[in-house]
A protein has these predicted regions:
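Cell-wall polysaccharide-cleaving catalytic domain and substrate-binding groove, primarily
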Residues: 1-156
Length: 156
């Protein structure tokens, strides 16, 4: 099933607005939720293991180029265990707040064309799941196709 691209764009604009400011694809937040760091439009993170596959997919050269100071450690954080990754990224923070150099580099990484493409792949996959759930619910309720509003509800 294909989801209307304008609906996906709306979901990608609305959902991050609850947790991010500015370009959601470049969002980077500290350990406010116990997940180490949370990055990107849908706040993928180290603690749940959702950020690591994205970092590995873009490759070490992209990470090192975008993160000249912290890139090698970011690669290590995403290549090892979740516990080791949490330990590394928590070292870049004061309490639950990212230090400015780490935040700037994470934002740079998340904003690279390769990482934007990785984020979009995952947004599109989530949109397909959301549309399936919305369609199932709508069909069971009254036999109609889901509305955009219903799709957005299931996306978030």
């Amino acid at each position: 099933m294909t989801v209307d691209p304008t609906w996906v764009a709306a979901a990608a604009a609305i959902t991050p607005g609850f947790e991010t400011v500015g370009d959601p694809f470049q969002a980077a937040a500290g350990d406010f939720d116990g997940m180490g760091i949370s990055c990107g439009a849908l706040q993928w993170n180290i603690g749940m293991g959702s950020l690591q596959p994205m970092v590995l997919a873009v490759g070490r050269p992209v990470v090192l180029a975008a993160m000249p100071v912290h890139g090698a450690r970011m690669w290590e954080a995403c290549s090892g265990t979740v516990n080791r990754g949490l330990q590394i990224v928590r070292g870049w923070q004061s309490g639950a707040t990212l230090k400015s150099s780490a935040k700037a580099e994470l934002r740079a990484l998340m904003g690279t064309p390769d990482m934007r493409a990785e984020q979009q792949k995952r947004i599109d996959a989530k949109a397909e799941i959301a549309m399936g759930l919305a369609r199932d619910w709508s069909m069971a309720r009254d036999g109609t196709e889901p509305t955009k509003r219903l799709f957005l509800w299931f996306f978030d």
